[in-house]
Amino acid sequence: MIRLRPYKSCDAAKIAGWLTDRDIFLKWGGDRFGEFPITPQIIDEKYSRNNGDCTEPDNFYPWIAFDDEHGVVGSFIMRYLKGDNHILRFGWVIVDDSLRGMGIGTQMLRAGLKYAFEILGVDKVTIGVFETNTPAHECYKKIGFTDRETVVKEPWNLIEMEIEACRNQNI
């Protein structure tokens, strides 16, 4: 069973270790983390000291997913959009590369949605996925996110997705 806990600085090395090639790195963080390869220090700086580059204080919440069998298995972040505490954004979703395709991402994000809707009481959660990241797009659709729009960007178009509190029956 997947459980969530807040990110700790010691998790940065694990996350950096999953970003094994430039393609995975770009699909995970786009241009937000600079150049590949990434170091644990860069991740920790962004997560622990820079509030995820959010301009609003106390607006960025990185999470770690873990289970009893494998330990730490994934990570993602939550942040409120423009300070609106009714809309939450998920992002920087990554799963241990040795466990991809085993449903870990689905379980992790379902746990995140449960927390978002039941504990935080948000009305909607959004997420973006690059058009070229078919496995992630399918994962997000599987748990109930629906495509809202496609934003034309370089190097890849971005599919904006959302799920509303009343539509979270798959959680």
For the regions a language model picked out, list residue spans one by one:
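Extreme N-terminal starter segment of soluble prokaryotic enzymes
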Residues: M1-I2
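Acetyl-CoA-dependent GNAT
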Residues: P6-C10, G17-S98, Y115, I119, ...
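Short helix-adjacent coil turns
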Residues: C10-D11, G103
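Residues that form or flank phosphate/diphosphate-binding pockets in enzymes
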Residues: V73, N85, G103, P135, ...
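C-terminal "cap" of GNAT-fold acetyltransferases
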Residues: L88, D123-H137, K142-I171
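Conserved acetyl-CoA-binding loop-helix of GNAT-fold acetyltransferases
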Residues: V95, G101-Y115, E138-K142
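Short coil/turn segments at alpha/beta junctions that flank glycine-rich nucleotide-binding fingerprints
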Residues: M102, E118-D123
